[in-house]
UniProtKB/Swiss-Prot annotation:
GO-annotated molecular function: rRNA binding; structural constituent of ribosome
Record keywords: Ribonucleoprotein, Ribosomal protein, RNA-binding, rRNA-binding
GO biological process: translation
Family label: Belongs to the bacterial ribosomal protein bL21 family.
InterPro entries assigned to the protein according to its UniProt record, in alphabetical order: bL21-like, bL21-like_sf, Ribosomal_bL21, Ribosomal_bL21_CS
Quaternary structure (record): Part of the 50S ribosomal subunit. Contacts protein L20.
Protein name listed in UniProt: Large ribosomal subunit protein bL21
Annotated function: This protein binds to 23S rRNA in the presence of protein L20.
GO annotation, cellular component aspect: cytoplasm; ribonucleoprotein complex; ribosome
Entry-linked Pfam families: Ribosomal_L21p (PF00829)
Amino acid sequence: MYAVIRTGGKQYKVSEGDFLKVEKLEGAVGDTVELKDVLMVGGETVAIGTPLVPSASVVGRIVDQGKDKKILVFKSKRRKNFRKMYGHRQPRTVLKIEKINA
């Protein structure tokens, strides 16, 4: 069984037992998170939502809270000797998908 969920403005295809790196979710390591934005559930039969599948949810456990790799941004203007480099590390959460409720 698999599901397509929406979190952090992105869509992910998940199955039970998968590890998923998503935008930061509130909660401590070990907490359970229920994601209710389920767009599609598949298996023997496929249920496609309009836009969400009613009464479907995905349960996951927070494995890690941390930061992603550094993203470098470089700006320059030609012929003006203007160069600027900066970056940031986006906060992220790692989830382990435990159960898909369809």
